Amino acid sequence: MVVVVLMSVVILGLTAMFTQTQRAFKAGMTQTDILEGGRMATEMLSRELEQIVPGYATLNLGRTNFYTVQESEFPMNLPANSVAQRTNIVSRIFYLTHENQTWTGIGYYLVPDSTVAPGLPVGVLNRFELSVSAATFGQQPSLMIFNFNRAMVGLSYQGTVSRILDGVVSFNFRTYDTNGYWINPSRATPPLGQITNHSDWSANFPITLYPPRVNYHFVGSAVPAYVEFELGILEQGALDHYKSIPVWLSQSNYLWQQSSRVQVFRQRVSVRNVDRSAY
């Protein structure tokens, strides 16, 4: 009898140990996947953003070099603090790159997951790309951004769209001038470093004025001197639990409490081909 009891205790102890080991192993694998995905996307964005070039297009229609537009924002409660909040912002971005006789338009945008309620910034980060010849770009500078806009709304388009990351809750950008100052609408002329050719640049606040968010549009000879971006990814376990909740309000309340399970990647990139005559 004593032997049976001892064997039962040993078996239960080993089972508990193996269960904890398995849980820790799975958590480590999930964390590794999240970090690797975030690092991959950050490296890809950084490498592309530093290659942004001005298109110098003279046609008024569609001569976009760089633009970002805020899509939505969602506050999340900070851990151990019932007052402070973190606001996740989701934006879309488009920019031009140039290599030899080829112009390429690249855009990133978030597609809400089909299992997630609309209006909440949790979704899949997609990457759009379309390359054209220099001759085609000279005649149709709006071709790439036109197809990017069609791809975003699910219409037929030229180019390719690739799925990059799942569970993205924050995707936001800021631009800076050659002196390192943040470009925003409250900086009217003539503060130091402000772009002087305003026909080639615009920045405006979206509907929400606080905290300050800025939509950017650079055309002609202007591109930002620096681009700072933030990418926030919800951990897989939290994302799976979030998707399993059938009620929109419950989903929202759950997401609001998960700021500690968002992995944030932030980087500031220097644009190599900035035309300083635009500043």
Region roles according to the model:
Residues M1-I52:
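Aliphatic-rich helix starts adjacent to a transmembrane/signal segment
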Residues K26-Q31, N147-S156, V247-Y254:
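Short helix/strand-bridging catalytic loops that position acidic/His residues to coordinate divalent metals
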Residues A27, D33, A41, L49-A84, ...:
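Short, glycine/small-hydrophobic-rich surface segments
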Residues Y56-L59, E99, Y157-Y279:
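Short linear sequence signals and composition-biased patches located at protein termini or domain-edge surfaces
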Residues V69-G180, N184, A188-S199:
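Surface-exposed loop/linker segments characteristic of extracytoplasmic
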